[in-house]
């Protein structure tokens, strides 16, 4: 842990304004965003699974509110055009998730751990990581996003022995707790800490 904290301290000063600015955007979305805005963010999180944040951002810009109203085949075609690896399947997930419209604002404002579990159980294409990602991107600070970049970093620094191939609730919470302790030692919430880790790995602060 100590070596990772040293690496993070070296980038803290340059990363902090970017992290704070990005998190303000997240909080604004959670507080002021409409159900449609929140649904578009949920759809972004569906798309980034087994793809990339950059691809998801590109798709979000191209499709916009089309996530809410485009017919299935049109949405699949749009995802094909932006280069998604699984356009048909992801379009099916997004269309099926429209049943959650009207519930998202309450989820964002509710208990983050209960909201995450609800999304894992009820949203298509959303697992523990994706549900954490959505809630963090709407201003929730308490959850860790255990994506492959973060897990590789954790393994490299001896925080975990191996990268899990899949997530059960128990396993996700166990690894999340390890990362939470590192975040606390760094003096940040898990949600913000993730952005510092991204800056360390990528040299930028995505979402």
UniProtKB/Swiss-Prot annotation:
One annotated GO biological process: base-excision repair
Disulfide bonds: none
InterPro entries: DNA_glyclase/AP_lyase_Ogg, DNA_glycosylase, HhH-GPD_domain, HhH_base_excis_C
Keywords: DNA damage, DNA repair, Glycosidase, Hydrolase, Lyase, Multifunctional enzyme
GO molecular function list: class I DNA-(apurinic or apyrimidinic site) endonuclease activity; hydrolase activity, hydrolyzing N-glycosyl compounds
Active-site residues, Swiss-Prot/TrEMBL: 129, 147
EC numbers on record: 3.2.2.-, 4.2.99.18
Keyword DNA damage: yes
Keyword Transcription attributed: no
Site (Important for guanine/8-oxoguanine distinction): 207
Catalytic activity, reaction form: 2'-deoxyribonucleotide-(2'-deoxyribose 5'-phosphate)-2'-deoxyribonucleotide-DNA = a 3'-end 2'-deoxyribonucleotide-(2,3-dehydro-2,3-deoxyribose 5'-phosphate)-DNA + a 5'-end 5'-phospho-2'-deoxyribonucleoside-DNA + H(+)
Cited Pfam families: Ogg-HhH
Family to which the UniProt record says this protein belongs: Belongs to the type-2 OGG1 family.
NCBIfam families named among the record's database cross-references: PRK01229.1
Biological function: Catalyzes the excision of an oxidatively damaged form of guanine (7,8-dihydro-8-oxoguanine = 8-oxoG) from DNA. Also cleaves the DNA backbone at apurinic/apyrimidinic sites (AP sites).
Protein name (Swiss-Prot/TrEMBL): 8-oxoguanine DNA glycosylase/AP lyase
Species name: Thermotoga sp. (strain RQ2)
């Amino acid at each position: 842990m100590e070596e990772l904290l040293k690496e993070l301290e070296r980038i803290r000063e340059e990363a902090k304004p970017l992290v704070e600015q990005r998190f303000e955007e997240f909080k604004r979305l959670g507080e002021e965003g409409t159900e449609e805005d929140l649904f578009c963010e949920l759809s972004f999180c569906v798309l980034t699974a087994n793809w990339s944040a950059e691809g998801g951002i590109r798709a979000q810009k191209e499709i916009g509110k089309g996530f809410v109203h485009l017919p299935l085949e049109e949405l699949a075609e749009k995802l094909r055009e932006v280069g998604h690896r699984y356009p048909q399947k992801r379009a099916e997930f997004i269309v099926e998730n429209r049943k959650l419209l009207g519930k998202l604002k309450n989820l964002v404002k509710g208990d983050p751990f209960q909201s995450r579990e609800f999304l894992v159980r009820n949203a298509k294409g959303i697992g523990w990581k994706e549900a954490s990602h959505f809630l963090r991107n709407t201003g929730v600070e308490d959850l860790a996003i255990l994506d492959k970049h973060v897990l590789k970093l954790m393994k490299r620094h001896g925080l975990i022995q191996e990268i899990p191939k899949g997530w059960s609730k128990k396993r996700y919470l166990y690894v999340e707790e390890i990362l939470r302790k590192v975040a606390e030692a760094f003096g940040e919430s898990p949600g913000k800490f993730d952005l510092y880790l991204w800056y360390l790995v990528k040299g930028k602060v995505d979402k």
